[in-house]
């Protein structure tokens, strides 16, 4: 620690701290323009100049490292004159259009001029004008170059934090201007972080343009509803209508940054596809009715359907309190453990739960990725969890964390990684087994004898040996290791085997003293919370097995009802039960299995065979189109609760308006259903349910609603001993020359909910098919061609996107476009999906030739 004195106030700071950071700790304000906390100091704006005793010239506080015994003054006549002169120079060419500028009322230049600027400008010359009109750089970002003060925040944010490198400067001197490539941002991430950090109105949000002033907005701090990173954001609404999103440096895992979905994708709540009133099926047609009529219909149709003849499926996008109450409703009112929270895959709980219990880290992401090594397994973190990617890039570049990649899809983070090991989709388990075997082989001592027998005979795929050697040597050298695992691993029919190999690697790292931490990279906002709340067929809240007598008794006493003893059916088994005519009632909340579960034909047949299909949602989904009863539920921002993100951080989800139309909150609808069965469901409010959760779920003990604050609160877990031992290695996957189709989220969408966003659709409305340049050339295809993808079960058409970094033999189709009906190509229990591709025009010509013959 060193001692510094600033404006006659002394304090001790860590060596390496800047004068600006020391002043902030004392509450002394030093004005800045170019400085931003997530970026290295630039010291170009000269607003933060201070006097340092013993130095002749003023020094920039943002870039000057404090020294022991240093004496600093921040508010002398010379400093005041210098600041005033700097502001006068900025105003010399700054347009006087504050009344029409969107930044009016929250402009840093306005604030600085009022606090430190001259009362009158010395300059009388005509102002420099680049363009007479604003330039629309992209569908969501618009620019007024005349207002730019050349702080370079936007350029550096785009390059150093986001990694897109879409903005840059052209010309020099007075003619310097910020712009995109060829005056456009068409190829950038459209995240809007440049807009967020712009201190003036140079970069603006086009969807928000001219809509409101900051003082007109009612602002609500809440959580992003898209991926599992759990970014904190502030929604601005006027008279209940969504206007914009901004974020705050001080709070949340994201520290002010957001991705395109979080900043521009929340307008989905204003979609025209909202369900306005309850509907029941009459004469084969869904007919709008009142809640009373819907209740009468349900009372007649529900009958005595319960137990194994009842099932429930709910979305992991909903709050913890809704998820908790749903599984409680299913178990105590409908008397069934047939509950699940995924409509895309069935998780092998018998291996997943022990891994989570033994290795999952509920620590801040910044702490977890600050370890010596971070191994990212599966998926594409750039597109699935963009803000997590920002944090990982920062860790690699500024904190010297060693990144390692093991996945099928390329990622922008590959450029910052020490080793990139390409895995075959569905073959991640084989790659993990190869890592374990290689790590055991280079370890001299300290390992049990049985490890060598259970990990021998596994080798990496052809061409991967160099990458494997680099990855293993980095793991061996590292003092501590974090594993970030994509949910892609759960899509494969080999998910169980893959998780076994993940367990092997975690065990081995623990034996080697690497202090392994595990976190999943969930692509749904509350998937972690859904697991914690027990929305799974074989566990109760807290991931406690149904078969555990003591745990079951504790919940039965609290709920005042008996819980079925046998584990229930997962989504796959429930659909099979429906198809066979054994499902009396299937209750689907916020989920759409008809569009998301593999084999659309099977799912449609199964849902149609259910005796009673109840769909509760904010939007009219494909599954709702088959329902017997449709109940309009509150959408995002219309009910309160909590989300638990990938870190295990529980955060408050706050509503900013009442449910639209005739919709009701999900909790109110659960109470409505329970009342029809004459089995009241208590408690019924978010806060009281939260209190019950904190009493019954060990990881949530000690949390309070009031204590969540702006940063949320971390759940806790004491790692349980691993008792499963080491699993046998996997055999090598079969090699095939057939193109293999994989799926996942694209950067601009998340699931299907984001398709209701007009803004996101303006950025990425058209579906696409992505493949390597090598494969495209082999098929005589070019970027932008309309192509046909055909499997044994179906086909689809979309534009081709050629990616030179994409692996040979793979085809990627995003899961986010409902019109594609991607699941109609897939077979249950098969992933990846073998396909063939051809150009649509060639296919049409071929068909015409066949007709002529």
From Swiss-Prot:
GO MF annotation terms: 2 iron, 2 sulfur cluster binding; 4 iron, 4 sulfur cluster binding; metal ion binding; molybdopterin cofactor binding; NADH dehydrogenase (ubiquinone) activity; quinone binding
Binding site for [4Fe-4S] cluster 1: 94, 98, 101, 107
Cofactor binding, note field: Binds 1 [2Fe-2S] cluster per subunit. Binds 3 [4Fe-4S] clusters per subunit.
Domain 4Fe-4S Mo/W bis-MGD-type: residue ranges: 217-273
GO BP annotations, alphabetical order: ATP synthesis coupled electron transport
Uppermost EC category: translocase
Keyword Signal attributed: no
A GO term from the CC aspect: membrane
Domain of life where this protein originates: Bacteria
Gene3D superfamilies in the cross-refs: 2.40.40.20, 3.10.20.740, 3.30.70.20, 3.40.50.740, ADC-like domains, Dimethylsulfoxide Reductase, domain 2
PANTHER family in the record: NADH-QUINONE OXIDOREDUCTASE SUBUNIT G, RESPIRATORY NITRATE REDUCTASE
Family: Belongs to the complex I 75 kDa subunit family.
This protein's name: NADH-quinone oxidoreductase subunit G 2
């Amino acid at each position: 620690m060193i001692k510094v004195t600033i404006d006659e106030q002394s304090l001790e700071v860590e060596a390496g701290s800047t004068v600006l950071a020391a002043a902030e700790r004392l509450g002394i304000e030093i004005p800045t323009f170019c400085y931003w906390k997530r970026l290295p100091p630039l010291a170009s704006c000269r607003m933060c100049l201070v006097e340092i005793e013993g130095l002749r010239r003023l020094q920039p506080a943002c870039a000057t490292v404090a020294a022991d015994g240093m004496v600093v003054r921040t508010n002398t006549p010379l400093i005041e004159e210098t600041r005033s002169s700097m502001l006068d120079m900025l105003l010399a060419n700054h347009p006087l259009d504050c009344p029409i500028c969107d930044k009016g009322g929250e402009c840093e230049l306005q604030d600085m001029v009022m606090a430190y600027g001259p009362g009158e400008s010395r300059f009388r010359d005509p102002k420099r004008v680049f363009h007479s009109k604003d330039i629309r750089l992209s569908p969501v970002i618009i620019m007024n170059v005349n207002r730019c003060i050349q702080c370079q925040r936007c350029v550096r944010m785009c390059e150093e934090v986001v990694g897109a490198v879409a903005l840059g400067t052209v010309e020099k001197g007075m003619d310097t201007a910020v712009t995109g490539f060829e005056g456009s941002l068409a190829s950038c991430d459209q995240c809007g972080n440049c807009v967020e950090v712009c201190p003036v109105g140079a970069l603006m949000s086009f969807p928000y343009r001219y809509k409101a002033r900051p003082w007109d907005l009612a602002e609500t701090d809440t959580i992003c509803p898209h991926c599992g990173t759990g970014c904190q954001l502030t929604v601005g609404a006027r008279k209940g209508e969504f206007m914009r999103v901004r974020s705050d440096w001080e709070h949340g895992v994201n520290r002010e940054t957001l991705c395109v979905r979080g900043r521009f994708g929340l307008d989905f709540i204003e979609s025209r596809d909202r369900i306005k009133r309850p509907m029941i099926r009459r004469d084969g047609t869904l007919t709008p009715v009142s809640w009373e009529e819907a209740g009468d219909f349900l009372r007649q149709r529900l009958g005595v359907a319960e137990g194994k003849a009842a099932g429930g499926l709910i979305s992991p996008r909903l709050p913890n309190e809704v998820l908790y109450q749903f599984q409680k409703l299913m178990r105590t009112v409908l008397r069934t453990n047939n509950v699940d929270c995924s409509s895309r895959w069935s998780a092998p709980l018998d291996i997943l739960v022990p891994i989570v219990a033994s290795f999952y880290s509920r620590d801040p992401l910044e702490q977890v990725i600050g370890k010596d090594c971070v191994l990212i397994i599966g998926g594409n973190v750039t597109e699935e969890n963009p803000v997590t990617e920002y944090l990982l890039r920062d860790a690699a570049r500024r904190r010297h964390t060693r990144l390692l990649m093991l996945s099928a899809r390329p990622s922008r983070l590959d450029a910052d990684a020490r080793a990139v090991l390409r895995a075959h989709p569905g073959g991640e388990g084989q790659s993990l087994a190869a890592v374990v075997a290689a790590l055991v082989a280079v370890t001299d001592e300290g390992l049990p004898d049985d490890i060598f027998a259970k990990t021998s005979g596994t080798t990496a795929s052809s061409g991967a040996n160099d990458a494997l050697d680099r990855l293993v040597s980095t793991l061996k050298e590292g003092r501590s290791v974090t594993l970030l695992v994509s949910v892609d691993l759960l899509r494969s029919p080999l998910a169980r085997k893959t998780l076994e190999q993940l367990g092997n690697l975690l065990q081995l790292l623990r034996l080697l003293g690497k202090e392994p931490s595990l976190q999943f990279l969930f692509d749904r906002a509350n998937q972690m919370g859904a697991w914690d709340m027990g929305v799974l067929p074989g566990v109760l809240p807290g991931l406690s097995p149904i078969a555990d007598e003591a745990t079951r008794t504790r919940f039965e006493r609290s709920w005042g009802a008996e819980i079925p003893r046998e584990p229930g059916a997962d989504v796959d088994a429930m659909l099979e039960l429906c198809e066979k005519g054994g499902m009396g009632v299937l209750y689907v909340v916020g989920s759409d299995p008809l569009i998301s579960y593999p084999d659309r034909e099977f799912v449609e047949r199964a849902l149609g065979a259910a005796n009673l299909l109840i769909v509760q949602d904010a939007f009219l989904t494909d599954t709702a189109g088959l329902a017997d009863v449709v109940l309009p539920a509150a959408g995002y921002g219309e009910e309160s609760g909590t989300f638990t993100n990938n870190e295990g951080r529980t955060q408050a989800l706050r509503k900013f308006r009442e449910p639209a139309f005739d919709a009701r909150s999900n909790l109110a609808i659960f109470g409505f259903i329970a009342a029809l069965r004459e089995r009241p469901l208590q408690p019924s409010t978010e806060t009281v349910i939260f209190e019950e959760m904190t009493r019954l779920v060990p990881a949530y003990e000690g949390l309070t609603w009031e204590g969540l604050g702006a940063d949320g609160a971390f759940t806790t877990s004491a790692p349980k001993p691993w008792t499963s031992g080491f699993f046998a290695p996997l055999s090598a996957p079969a090699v095939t020359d057939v193109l293999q189709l994989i799926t996942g989220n694209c950067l601009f969408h998340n699931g299907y909910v984001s398709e209701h966003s007009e803004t996101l659709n303006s950025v990425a409305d058209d579906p696409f098919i992505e493949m390597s340049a090598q494969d495209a050339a082999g098929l005589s295809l070019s970027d932008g061609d309309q192509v046909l993808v055909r499997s044994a079960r179906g086909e689809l058409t979309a534009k081709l996107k050629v990616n030179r970094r994409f692996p040979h033999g793979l085809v990627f189709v995003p899961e986010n476009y409902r019109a594609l009906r991607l699941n109609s190509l897939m077979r249950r229990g098969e992933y990846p999906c073998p396909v063939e591709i051809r150009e649509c025009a060639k296919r049409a010509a071929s068909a015409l030739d066949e007709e002529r013959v």
